[in-house]
Amino acid sequence: MGAVLGACTAASCAANLACCCGSAACSLCCNFCPTCKNSTSTRIVYSIFLLFGLVVSCIVLAPGIRHKLNQIPYLCEHASETCDSIVGYLAVYRVCFGLAAFFLLFCLLMYGVTSSRDVRSKIQNGFWGIKILLFLGAIVAAFFIPQGKFSEVWMYFGLIGSFLFILIQLVLLVDFAHTWNSSWVGRMEESGSKVWAVLLLCATFLMYGFCVAGIVCLYVYFTYSQESSCHTNKFFISFNLILCIIASVLAIHPKVQERLPTSGLLQASVISLYTVYLTWSALSFQPDKNCNGFYETHITLAGMDSQAIIGVILMFVMVVYASVRTASSSQVGKLGMSSPKHSSALDKETTVLSEGDETRSDVGLVEEGGEGRRVYDDEDGGVAYSYSFYHFMLMLASLYIMMTLTNWYKPVGSDFSKLQYSETAVWVKIASSWLCQLIYIWTLLAPALFPDRDFS
């Protein structure tokens, strides 16, 4: 009897494991969630993979974990005195390498998928048990890579990837601001209430208030020094301030409003605040300690600081936003996150089977109970988003996590025995802040400069 019960238990566990390897895993994850699309639930699961990598990276920065990692010979072979503070950064490099390799693999594997009938579409939306093992295996395998030049080379990959992710993050922020503005304006027009207009004005003034406060703090902490004139920092702050003013003026210019009625100060305030954040983030790692009010703080503070916390929170919020925002008319869709063949299907009303109706397939409509909570297939007419580009974005997000959690430090020497501020990191962030503003200004000017072209 015991053997029979044991066999039944094993069979039950095997069945449950097999279920997790199929497409039904997403629907099982959404058992307690409202009705959602299969494509959305899939992206949320991949976002959870990224969140897991972020959590693991934060954990390995903890002092207790560092002590355990110190026992791995090649990690601390030459670091000696500073190993206790460095090994955490090495671990983050390796965790994020495994994370990036996992998403890069799926980015290449899913390249060119345009139909849900493609066998690779089944891989994208299913086999979650195998993916979990592959995901964990990639992270563990990264710890067995010989040190050599790994840290130095991988840091430059991180700089490039972080720069690209900052630009993608800008597009997501612009789309978020447009959506926010359109939503509140629409509610104001529907209800006829001025409450929404007041809220819109308050949000805009609040954003600009943070911008002004941020600019003042930048001048106080990064330009005042008795030993140095800090001309470079003054130029960075002043130039970005001018760009913010230009963008704000253009956003409400009559010619721009005529061709782009959706533009407004709310969007400009969000982009301006993001520019101030990037400027602060860049100047915080200025190698000249005479012109860096946070120099001593960053040198003595191990692990995450306020800038890293803000960075990773903003990053993850934007990734989740990209996971649920797929309309082809949005900036997310124009970025490549939405499939053109699927755009018409997104505008049609999707009918969800009621209780008692027959489900179509494992990846079709999935009934989740009598309360109407279920995951339904929205990719019959084609894929709802670019699988490859979504994984590419997550790969860049992994590199951004790595650089943010390691404070954009530059390893000196192949043994990572010394850390220093990187002038390259400063210029990467400053250049990204300029490019962000220039891209936004171009989106305002282009419809007015080229009226014959469709920029809707």
From Swiss-Prot:
Record's bilayer topology term: Multi-pass membrane protein
Main location: endoplasmic reticulum
Membrane-spanning residues: 10-32, 44-64, 95-115, 126-146, 153-173, 195-215, 234-254, 265-285, 301-321, 383-403, 430-450
Superkingdom in the source lineage: Eukaryota
Keyword line: Endoplasmic reticulum, Lipid biosynthesis, Lipid metabolism, Membrane, Phospholipid biosynthesis, Phospholipid metabolism, Transmembrane, Transmembrane helix
GO biological process terms on file: phospholipid biosynthetic process
Family in the record: Belongs to the TDE1 family.
Pfam families assigned to the protein according to its UniProt record, in alphabetical order: Serinc
GO cellular component annotations of the record: endoplasmic reticulum membrane; membrane
Subcellular location: Endoplasmic reticulum membrane
S-S bridge residues: none
Designated name of the protein: Probable serine incorporator
Source organism of the structure: Nematostella vectensis
Function description: Enhances the incorporation of serine into phosphatidylserine and sphingolipids.
